[in-house]
Amino acid sequence: MRLEAVVLAQDLTKHFRVALKEESLLGTLRHFLFRQYRLVRAVEGVSFAIRRGEVVGFLGPNGAGKTTTLKMLTGLLHPTRGEALVAGHVPWRREKAFLRKITLVMGNKQQLIWDLPAMDTLRLNAAIYEVPEGEFRKRVGELAEMLGLEGKLHQPVRKLSLGERMKAELLAALLHRPEVLFLDEPTLGLDVNAQVAVREFVRAYNARYGATILLTSHYMADIAALCERVLVIHHGRLLYDGALEGLLARFAPYREVRLVLAKPLPREALKAFGEVREVEGREARLLVPRAGLTERVALILKGLPVEDLEVKEPPLEEVIARVFQSPKEVEG
């Protein structure tokens, strides 16, 4: 697998020294004369490999080390320890050939110039990456069509909606046709329709150009829609690297059964068929063990006045919350 890896991290570690300062004038003087530090272990011994064309989700709570890892893989931070190769280059050397092959999109940062049309930023990026005029027009046309931005690129960025600005940010970041995309919360703050549009674009871009993508997101719908494989990081340590289905099977040994009944029933009448999570009128939601699911569904159909029944995976948010609540179980 490592021979095929486009992104390779080996024992990647980043520690920060954070200065400690007491309040008050005396504390300021002590801080100036006898400065003390606290060591923050942001990332500790992270290793993984990503093959060409993979879309991998990178999950973790705030402060887990996701963004720090991305910054090391894009060369913005030098690691305290460890090695990395991205598209055949050591990231923190920041070689010109390396920068042409990668891009980093952060949902809380922007490169578009606020008071100018997005097209001006695109032309600036084209000059930086030495994209010929003919190729520039072709790429802008392709990406604008994929993103639904036709007619929007000549408006000042400040007049675009949040969703349109994020799409324009993606267009600017992908103008040089990078091989490896690092997407850090690309749907942050977007409404549901804009989130779906960005997800569909990422899927289409990966299919059309075979790009390798490492995606962080707090919106589990992004991960479920785009990623078959996930990395889970917590307190700077990698807890899980594998299939999303494997994570679900390990931390959600149950399926969700949604029922529409012919008449309302009390919660007590449903307890014999599974763990009752919700009852509202004629609708109910039960958790049923994966083992023996078929038999349990047959009992439900036989013992309850069912008008409609749907079996689903539990919400990914619930599964991830369980992972972070019991990290030792993941490591074990």
Cite the ranges covered by each PLM segment:
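ABC transporter nucleotide-binding domain
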Residues: R199-L287
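Short, charged/small-residue-rich alpha-helical element at the C-terminal edge
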Residues: R255-S326
